Amino acid sequence: SMYQLWKMILQETGKNAVPSYGLYGCNCGVGSRGKPKDATDRCCFVHKCCYKKLTDCSPKTDSYSYSWKDKTIVCGDNNPCLQEMCECDKAVAICLRENLDTYNKNYKIYPKPLCKKADAC
């Protein structure tokens, strides 16, 4: 679910997901997609592409199990679609952490009309 994604992002980055990434660049947040502005935005682009592969579950509402062990996200005992969703969320949270050093405050609330058409997944 969105709540689990936000929690993973907080655990990995130390940043509150909604204010930090909710409107970041062209790909972070609901419904947006465009040519990534930077590495952080590319994390979100890849995450949206990961979600597009999910056919039997809904990322916004369905919940999966995971745990936080030794500062590591461990996806739990889920059905195949929920497991894949958990792995998508885990990957974006780690990607955002790995790119914290290039997080650009100028992209925090980026006007979506300025986004150019995205590449295909």
Curated annotation (Swiss-Prot):
InterPro entries: PLipase_A2, PLipase_A2_Asp_AS, PLipase_A2_dom, PLipase_A2_dom_sf, PLipase_A2_His_AS. Residues 105-117 are annotated as: Important for membrane-damaging activities in eukaryotes and bacteria. The keyword Transport does not apply. CDD domains: PLA2c (cd00125). Expressed by the venom gland. It is found in: Secreted. The record marks 105, 108 as: Important residue of the cationic membrane-docking site (MDoS). GO terms for molecular function: calcium ion binding; calcium-dependent phospholipase A2 activity; phospholipid binding; toxin activity. Disulfide bonds join 26-115, 28-44, 43-95, 49-121, 50-88, 57-81, 75-86. This is Basic phospholipase A2 homolog GodMT-II. Snake venom phospholipase A2 homolog that lacks enzymatic activity but shows high myotoxic activities. In vivo, induces a mild edema when subcutaneously injected into mice foot pad. The record marks 112, 117 as: Cationic membrane-docking site (MDoS). Its main location: secreted. The keyword Lipid biosynthesis does not apply. Transmembrane segments: none annotated. Monomer. Pfam families: Phospholip_A2_1 (PF00068). The lineage of its organism: Eukaryota, Metazoa, Chordata, Craniata, Vertebrata. One of its GO terms (cellular component) is extracellular region. Is not inhibited by the gamma-phospholipase A2 inhibitor (PLI) CgMIP-I (AC P0DQP7) and by the alpha-PLI CgMIP-II (AC P0DQP8).
